[in-house]
């Protein structure tokens, strides 16, 4: 029998590659024991990039979620790992050194064992400091090679990076094939090169299933020494996500590898529970197109997880481009026409901006440059005339060293615009920030939290954390969720049917008198404007719902009927209403 292969369930990435949000703390705590019961996973990806930010956007505390999800795995010896964007840590832009260092201390205390550190440019300068801080914080540093196909991304290129990372203290290497475009034979050779030189180094393969190469890649890397394979489970496996663990284990077992058995009863429970989370609310933010694989992405190399946002961008751009074409007397473009044009433009742009690996955030920059080029060429302005500072920052070297050469046209354009190229170590441009955030927390009377985790959260995601603390994030989220639900219903119902459906389980709150409506009153010294409540707000029976200023100058208190959840508002703060008008609808809790 061949060597033993272990498996990781990338539960965080399953959701990130499918939609906008992550499960709540209670949902994660509910499914963790079932994942353990499956018996086939030695690792689980519990948190990391995007996980914490979208928790805050949903009005939830990510620290509570991480602790609740990691704890059951810690108790049984299943290792937990997180995604770490190196210089950018958990967000999309650079993070000061002191905040990055604090992250590893906090995450280790919360129960995260391994940090997968990657840099979108494969610039080791953005990774190596994190290796040191991870070890100091008590975590295992696993360093990633961002896989792509280009003339500069050779076996020697990747081996040179692996050499530097291992010399700096990396204990594991991940082959991170985010777009799933790594050629299987190439990945097998790379795995063998690393294993032959560093037999003690653990190699973990992470490949998305988008263009259909990932199963062949898994077989190649395992036959050449890989130790651990990232997998998914239904209903979020395949498509633009990851291969399903059932298929991977079946393939490797028949190849002669030692693999664990799957408790299929537990698998079906985890499958049903994940579907339950989708049905409850997460599915309203999942693009159905992410369930579809596409070989079209092999040519341009863009990650499949971008397809949803990319198609939305194309939809808006198509109308603008077709308006221009109509004025010129040219034939309009279909979505398919425009998609192929975009893929072709990415293939044109990518080498000219130096072949940055097409992973977050550089895949977005290359896509956006290409999309803007399509528009400006239709306008007769040529290419590269609509690039923002983020796009230029990548080209100029402000995010790290670009693997290839920048096209002379762009070098000349940068000079004309007074932009300067740099090879500076990006993290040295940042100043420490924790003292400023401590001052802000002290002034607001906010606790630093267990192991300084709340301080870390503010420092990592300042805007989102402030909105979370004020309650605005939860209000915004519930309103977005209601809009998403209405949109889904509205796609199959007439407006009248939609209103009837929404109000079937709801009580109408009716104005008892005519007058002017007031949803709330502000206390002395409050500077926030009074506004109507957020959709989803909970009321108890008899609560004051709103107030009406009657024509005779007295306020009439309107009670919240039998209580429940606010589902629709028909009257804004300060508006005039008539007696008998419906102010809002409250949906009672199920008996």
What do the PLM-derived regions correspond to, one by one?
Residues 1-18, 66-71:
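N-terminal amphipathic alpha-helix/helix-capping segment at the start of soluble metabolic enzymes
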Residues 5-13, 42-46, 78-85, 115-117, ...:
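Hydrophobic faces of well-ordered beta-strands that scaffold small-molecule active sites
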Residues 33, 48-163, 180-183:
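Active-site beta->alpha loop and helix N-cap motifs at the rims of alpha/beta catalytic domains
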Residues 36-54, 292-297, 301-507:
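Terminal or standalone catalytic/regulatory effector modules within metabolic enzymes
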Residues 117, 177, 224-243:
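Glycine-rich phosphate-binding active-site loops on the catalytic face of alpha/beta enzymes
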Residues 153-165, 211-227:
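Catalytic cores of alpha/beta
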Residues 237-262:
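C-terminal helical cap(s) of enzyme catalytic domains, especially alpha/beta-barrels
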Residues 493-547, 554-557, 563, 568:
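Acidic, low-complexity mobile loops and tails
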